[in-house]
């Protein structure tokens, strides 16, 4: 069983970001104290008291200074992230980035709280199959043979969408309501978003980026003005090749030239080619299904 929380893709045209409340007062803590859901442990309550986690406020100047220092440390220390539009990233890079944020914004106590609650360190994963969410924070719960429930947390980042962005698409890239000028900035914003999910999961056991508490935490801690991303999706990437869902395309397969219709676009395009021997679909026709790399497809007119 698992609960997951993601940085969703913005499906609407880019517009002025929603105005979120940046509140240096203790209203968030007051909201938390009035909720029916208590903090998980005394240790976690001590953590939030120490860092003032539920009523944080960083000025724009503080946020800029801290994130600039983190960016410089990443470029200096990482074996992969040596340039802003990096071409390679590893889970060690994600762990390093999280650690820098944890120490800079939470005095290193967020990772400690994760370990104290689950007995396991926070895990990281790069996903080449996530096609809508820029990142995802997951709480896994497994029942052990002893009947105890083992929980652990994981932050996943959509590496494929990161690498498709800042290449050929000439448009603003907005993540969490902030315009990003390069791939590293986008990775920063994704990590910040997932950190807020992690904070809420650790303290409350649930998190929603559409909720008021999440939006105000993200605004106060990191200066976010939104909760979605506009990274390049596989569909937008495919459109650069003139390929969209419903497009008629041709391709070579085992020495034959086939013509079919694009039914879906993710990492590869799903192409349906009419064939009397194939299974029947809802339109009454028979098709064989092919999963094709975009570069092997070309538009066809029939």
Q: Which residue ranges define each predicted feature?
A:
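Active-site recognition of the HExxH zinc-binding catalytic motif
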Residues: 189-202
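Membrane-proximal N-terminal segments immediately preceding the first transmembrane helix
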Residues: 69-71
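Metalloprotease/metallohydrolase-associated module, dominated by Zn2+-dependent proteases
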Residues: 11-27, 32-65, 75-185, 202-302
